[in-house]
A protein has these predicted regions:
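Transition segments tied to proteolytic processing and entry into folded domains
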Residues: 2, 8, 13-213
């Protein structure tokens, strides 16, 4: 407990919380609207699957986290089979610490949230070197809930296809229709097909999918 920690331990934990809080605040306040080029271009992993479990805890360094396990149906980017587990910053809800204090460091507003059993598509950054935490690209923008044959991120897909230029010769009719979506759910099969082709064909690297402006 904090009341029994040595001064050095207290300072170490305080430093961890300060550094983590600063990085979280910076990420939250600086998030801009991202489109498909950004999501694909900045992701290390792109996973389509079902949320198996969502738990939370506090690691040995005192960093609060939410742990998510995905049953992976398809890894659109990355060599992942079966299940994938990652942790992002923040608790699911405030937690009593048993020493008269309450840890209020919950998942920040605008970050991806998860529900057991939901089908989802995730665009994930690489794990942070220091904390091991991992978040979706653009926070809530990089997590899509699949429902009723549609896929939609936590920003209702606003700006997802804005300023996206793709060589027309690469697109089938359903992908072309998907690109017309300005807001709201996009057909999940068309969206997954589009992302799969972009990754496998290295469209961004070849300049065949790019920012229009």
């Amino acid at each position: 407990m904090l009341s029994r920690m040595r001064p050095l331990q207290k300072w170490t934990q305080a430093a961890i919380f300060i550094l983590t809080a600063v990085s979280i605040t910076t990420a939250t306040t600086s998030t801009r609207q991202l489109n498909l080029v950004d999501l694909v271009g900045q992701s290390q992993l792109i996973l389509h699957g079902t949320v198996k479990s969502v738990t939370d805890g506090i690691d040995s360094r005192g960093i609060p986290y939410t742990e998510v396990t995905i049953r992976v149906a398809e890894a659109l980017r990355g060599d992942i089979n079966g299940e994938y587990t990652f942790r992002q910053f923040g608790l699911l809800k405030p937690r009593a610490m048993g020493n008269g204090t309450v840890n209020l460091m919950v998942t920040p507003a605008g970050w991806a949230t998860y529900t057991k059993g939901e089908e989802t598509i995730l665009f994930l950054y690489k794990r942070a070197a220091w904390t091991g935490l991992q978040t979706t690209v653009g926070l809530g923008q990089g997590k899509f809930k699949v429902q009723m044959a549609g896929a939609m991120n936590q920003m209702s897909n606003a700006g997802l296809f804005q300023n996206v230029a793709i060589d027309s010769s690469l697109l089938g009719s359903r992908e072309q229709r998907a690109l017309l979506t300005q807001k709201g759910a996009v057909n999940v099969n068309a969206f997954v097909s589009l992302v799969r082709q972009a990754v496998q064909g290295k469209w961004i690297e070849a300049g065949r999918m790019r920012h229009a402006q």
